[in-house]
């Protein structure tokens, strides 16, 4: 399958970025607890993955509605489309593991090691977020999640806008 190239002007990209930031803020800005932030961001990122698949695949809607795909499988389908970068995909897989640890073990405590597993694939921003958080795990988590979800939203909203499916 040939990888599709998307062409967008600087103004279109600026508008897409603005839409992504507004959308993320509407879902995640009021979440205070680190655990709730992780869970809410996971739900939102899953929605973004579904929208991405529906927009990119001719029968994507049927796949999402009838396929009973797990989060991990949705990441794999998104990766198979061939547009998203591998670092983002790796980070999403590790993010899902962290969410599963929290969701399936009520006594589980989120750790910096878990955060690093999904922040390191994001590149240099991982170290920047560690420094900016000044030792506060909750703040480092917030910065990392916002960046992770923003990157995913960027891909999703870009293809939705360029295909005319963004609402």
Q: What are these model-derived regions, one by one?
A:
Residues 1-79, 83-167:
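Amphipathic alpha-helical interface elements
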């Amino acid at each position: 399958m040939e990888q599709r190239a998307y062409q967008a002007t600087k103004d279109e990209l600026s508008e897409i970025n603005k839409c992504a930031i507004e959308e993320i803020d509407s879902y995640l800005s009021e979440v205070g607890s680190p655990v709730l932030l992780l869970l809410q961001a996971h739900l939102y990122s899953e929605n973004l993955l579904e929208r991405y698949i529906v927009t990119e695949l001719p029968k994507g809607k049927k796949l999402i509605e009838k396929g009973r795909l797990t989060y991990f499988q949705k990441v794999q389908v998104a990766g198979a489309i061939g547009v998203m970068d591998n670092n983002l995909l790796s980070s999403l897989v590790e993010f899902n593991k962290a969410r599963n640890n929290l969701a399936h073990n009520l006594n589980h405590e989120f750790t910096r090691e878990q955060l690093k597993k999904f922040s390191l694939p994001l590149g240099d921003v991982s170290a920047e977020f560690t420094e900016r958080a000044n030792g506060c795990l909750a703040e480092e988590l917030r910065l990392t999640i916002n960046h992770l979800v923003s990157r995913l939203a960027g891909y999703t909203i870009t293809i939705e806008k360029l295909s005319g499916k963004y609402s």
